[in-house]
Design a protein with these regions (language model features):
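Hinge/lid segment of periplasmic solute-binding proteins
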Residues: 98-153, 167-171, 281-287
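Glycine-centered hinge/linker elements that transmit conformational signals in sensory
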Residues: 212-246, 272, 281-286
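Conserved N-terminal structural module of periplasmic/extracytoplasmic solute-binding proteins
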Residues: 1-100, 360-363, 367, 421, ...
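Short, solvent-exposed loop/beta-turn-alpha elements that line the ligand-binding surface or hinge
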Residues: 114-127, 205-226, 285-296, 429
Length: 452
């Protein structure tokens, strides 16, 4: 007997009868190696489904997170990266925003997926969400395809952050000055190291170009990033903190905090954010000196086909299966398939009402129909908020956030280590921001050249 459950809430039990088969009657399948560092639940389920349904291919997963140790969580990530760079390359990569995909692409290790999309009779560019894919392109080529997406951003209260034409470090400091003394930009628990990693991952494509082999850390934009990080504590002293815990939402509403860094993954997230902030939420993003929006797309998993893949048609067949309507509609995050996104939006904006046995709406004491909640969400010390239909204004807001976002979260552990090492002197006060940025520029430039 087997038991299966799915992320859309469905489940089933099956009684299976196993019958011995002649080995000669079993059609061999081409095995394709998929390497990852941790495997998303949705993707794992799709691999199982694909392996059962495909007569020609079988995806074999090697999860390098099993090499993580108590002393080094990233040991498996280092091992995977080392193997890829040395030529031991899998057929498919599943990236959970931790692999240096742009570096692999610059080395010629990854296939451009646009030709596969364009040649597929059941798929086309206009069937996919445009903005996340545009942000992943390198010189017009698409080396990784997300199964879903969210938007990493920063939220503020409209009464505080409205009225700014730009959102630079100076603008953030000006907005902060409107709050009571002692207010912080983000929650007081965030440290310099956490915020530095956050900001670099969101802005990596602004400072590094693997195709050209160049970087731009000795710049006003990067120095502004370091200056933004410096006011955060090096470590947070939890033992000396006698105050009761307050969530980001509570601190925002109480004037103790300017911004809340978060990610929008679904229409439920959108509704909750507006409700928790009394409909005064503004998705202003992180400060950027170049005038662009300080948001970045993210994904639970992006998929790549390597140039050494033993059967690229088979690899694409698997990736193509993640774009099927049923799979896309079942995802927790925003679907990358446009029709599934639109279907989810329509469902989120449709309000259901209580009815009697005959299907007639039940009215409250004021003669109004009684809306049905689709569930509830809570965060930290915030009370449970019942979820109802998303309004047109809220939908327009999230679409504006998506349409204005041009970056995708990108992470390279080696580059992050260099930045952390050289930024430490500035953050501790022993170096100027100019000295730190020049050292980072020099070391990252050398690292890029060594990787060619």
């Amino acid at each position: 007997m087997t038991y299966e459950s799915s992320n859309d809430g469905g489940s089933r039990q099956q009684i299976l009868v196993l019958a011995r088969a002649d080995a000669d009657s079993v059609q061999p399948k081409t095995e394709l190696a998929l390497a990852c560092f941790g495997l998303d639940y949705n993707l794992r389920s799709q691999i199982v489904k694909f392996n059962r349904s495909s007569a020609d291919y079988r995806i074999v997963v090697k999860d390098y997170s099993e090499y993580a140790t108590d002393d080094d969580y990233n040991a498996g990530l280092t091992k995977l990266n080392t193997e890829i760079i040395s030529g031991n390359i899998p057929d498919i990569l599943a990236n959970s925003m931790l692999l240096p995909i742009r570096q692999y692409a610059a080395k010629g290790l990854l296939e451009d997926l646009w030709p596969y999309i364009d040649a597929d009779p059941e798929c086309s560019r206009d069937k996919l969400m445009t903005k996340p894919l545009e942000s992943l392109q390198t010189d017009g080529k698409l080396y990784q395809l997300p199964i879903d997406f969210g938007v990493t951003t920063a939220i503020g209260l409209g009464k505080v952050v409205d009225g700014y034409d730009t959102w630079t470090l100076a603008d953030v400091n000006d907005a902060l000055s409107k709050l009571p003394e002692g207010a912080t930009v983000f929650n007081k628990y965030y440290t310099q190291a956490e915020m530095l990693q956050y900001c670099v991952a969101m802005n990596a494509d602004s400072f590094m170009n693997w195709q050209d082999g160049t970087c731009n850390f000795d710049s006003d934009e990067f120095r502004a990033l370091l200056e933004f990080v410096k006011p955060f504590p090096a470590e947070y002293d939890w033992q000396s903190d006698s105050e009761e815990y307050e969530s980001d939402y509570s601190r925002l509403k109480n004037g103790k905090q300017l911004l809340y860094p978060t990610s929008l993954y679904s229409f439920d997230d959108l509704y909750y954010t507006f409700a928790a902030l009394n409909n005064d939420a503004r998705f202003v993003g992180f400060p950027r000196e170049d005038g662009s929006t300080g948001n970045a797309f993210n994904s639970d998993a992006t998929l790549c086909i390597t140039t050494t893949c033993k059967d690229k048609a088979g690899a694409w067949a698997f990736i193509r299966s993640t774009l099927e309507e049923d799979f896309q509609k079942s995802l927790w995050n925003f679907p990358i398939l446009k029709s599934a996104f639109e279907a989810n939006a329509k469902e989120a904006m449709t309000q259901e009402y209580e009815t009697d046995a005959d299907g007639n709406q039940i009215l409250d004491e004021n003669g109004n129909p009684i809306p049905i909640s689709t569930g509830g969400m809570s965060y930290g010390d915030e009370p449970m908020i019942e979820l109802y239909a998303v309004t047109q204004e809220q939908y327009d807001t999230v679409m504006a956030v998506i349409d204005s976002t041009t970056s995708f979260v990108d992470y390279d552990q080696n580059v992050m280590n260099i930045i952390s090492d050289e930024a430490a002197g500035y953050l501790a006060g022993s170096k100027t921001v100019e000295e730190a940025s020049k050292l980072i520029q020099s070391r990252v430039s050398l690292y890029i050249q060594e990787q060619k």
